[in-house]
A protein has these predicted regions:
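N-terminal Rossmann-like NAD(P)+-binding domain of SDR-like oxidoreductases, especially those catalyzing
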Residues: 1-124
Length: 124
């Protein structure tokens, strides 16, 4: 069971909010009363759930790349979240075969950047 009071007013920083699962997470968190900031690449498909649900109108949405440590760290620390949910990734197996370096940079080093940036947040 979900304690809806837990999420009410919580500052949640969500990576990957333009993807399918991240979009659903943004909608869910918003419905529970969280203050959500999303950070992700532009929506990966057209149409996308992100655009169709107009998620950028209900949360603070920033288009950016987790591989850019300085931009990501500034965005995260400026928001000063209570909770960080990391959903940004390159999830496609075929794409990983075609672009293994980009997949590694995003999924491994991007996650390192998220964790390194989180260390600078006093509320996390």
């Amino acid at each position: 069971m979900i304690d809806q009071n837990f999420w009410q007013g919580k500052r949640v920083f969500l990576t990957g909010h333009t993807g399918f699962k991240g979009s659903w997470m943004a909608l869910w968190l918003n419905s529970l009363g969280a203050i959500v900031k999303g950070y992700a690449l532009s929506p990966p498909t057209d149409p996308s759930l992100f655009n169709e649900a107009k998620i950028d109108s209900i949360i603070d949405s920033q288009i950016g790349d987790i591989r850019d440590l300085e931009l990501f760290k500034r965005s995260l620390t400026d928001f000063n979240p209570d909770i960080l949910i990391h959903m940004a990734a390159q999830p496609l197996v075929r794409s990983s075969y075609a672009n293994p370096v980009e997949t590694y940079e995003t999924n491994v080093m991007g996650t390192v950047n998220v964790l390194e940036s989180a260390r600078a947040c006093k509320n996390l």
